[in-house]
Amino acid sequence: MTNWDLPPVGTPSVICFLDETGVVAQDAHFAVGVLTVPENSDLPTQVRKFRQRSGWTGEWHFSKLNEKGLRVFKGLIDVLRDHSGWSFRLTLADRAALDVAEVCGDRFVAYERIAAQSVASSMVAGTQAVVLADEYSTPDTVRFEEDVRWCVNSEAGGNVVAGVVRVTSDCHDLMQASDVLTGALVYPYRQGRSRSGKRPSAKRRLADYAQAELAGRVPVSPFDPSWVALPGRAR
């Protein structure tokens, strides 16, 4: 029998929904957020029920938020607030502190390393993860799925990530929830404080609402340069 390095039978699984915002080699702030739930979570059901109650048939995308959609976006935050079975971690790369793309020598490697840190910080002890990552266009030579899995497993010293696959955001409501959380948490870093005397935008109000309603549950961590130093996977 092949001696594969596999976790024990019955190891609990978690699903990680990974989304990014920004252009890593261009924007002042680039971030990767990961929403994690157990495989038996009823959070998807609760989000689906809210979608049905609210009559919302579109996708939740922070970048497309306007006044008309603010109520239903806040409702999504309320569903998350009222549910305990999830976690969210966001890794923020600030180019003023460290230009990750320049240090890595490649913007796609930079994205992989930032994503790997977010996934690693999302891992739950004694579990194995499957990562669903929002579709991100890369050249054919970039093996994002393999590289992120290798980086996280190498750092953990075991098979904590079973696989990574890129999917479109319309495949799952929680992929869209990860998009909303990622965008809302990064927004204040990009836009600064609200201007006094001016009505805040819908995005600003949702960002403030998410911070208030999910206080302590959506930590933002700076990118750790040690992920750059992690040896690359053998080609």
What are these regions (language model features)?
Residues M1-R235:
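Phosphate-ester processing/binding pockets and catalytic centers
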